[in-house]
């Protein structure tokens, strides 16, 4: 079962930001069946958008190569921005575009789930950058870790959060 953590975005109306492991992760024998169950749970929580950070090769390695098809089957909007595990994106232009898209959706009161593998490093990174861009907090790293312990796993991720100009 999927149990995403909510990152409070007050005072932003009804837009919501959630972080989790990938749908299907807890599936022991059949990850696709678990992914279906997890996606149904996300629908119950009124999640509108799934933002995936896994690389395509990871999907195969994790035995959930059809995850994106399942996301579409369950009628979620889907944003895809692959980031190598334990690292930070190199292309800042594409990163800013991705963040702008997600922030626009939040400001339209959409509910977004961000996931990578465990929902810690890459997901925490993107959540922190969204909070920084939206001006939710001045120190996004401890803020995200308060709601998702273990989030933002590497110095490279921490440095990017501190240094990236999002104006």
Regions flagged by a language model, labelled:
Residues 1-113, 125-167:
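Cys-dependent protein tyrosine phosphatase-like superfamily
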Residues 116:
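Short cysteine clusters
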Residues 122:
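Conserved SAM/SAH-binding loop-helix junction
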């Amino acid at each position: 079962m999927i149990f995403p953590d909510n990152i409070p975005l007050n005072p932003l109306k009804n837009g919501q930001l959630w972080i989790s492991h990938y749908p299907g992760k807890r599936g022991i024998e059949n990850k696709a069946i678990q992914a279906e169950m997890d996606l149904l749970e996300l629908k119950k929580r009124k999640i509108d958008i799934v933002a995936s950070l896994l690389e395509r090769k990871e999907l195969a390695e994790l035995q959930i190569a059809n995850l994106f098809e399942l996301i579409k089957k369950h009628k979620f909007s889907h944003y895809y921005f692959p980031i190598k595990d334990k690292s930070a994106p190199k292309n800042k232009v594409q990163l800013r575009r991705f963040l702008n898209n997600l922030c626009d959706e939040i400001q339209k009161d959409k509910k977004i789930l961000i996931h990578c593998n465990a929902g810690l490093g890459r997901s925490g990174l993107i959540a922190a950058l969204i909070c920084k861009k939206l001006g939710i907090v001045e120190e996004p790293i401890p803020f995200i870790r308060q709601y998702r312990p273990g989030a933002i796993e590497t110095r490279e991720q921490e440095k990017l959060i501190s240094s990236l100009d999002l104006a």
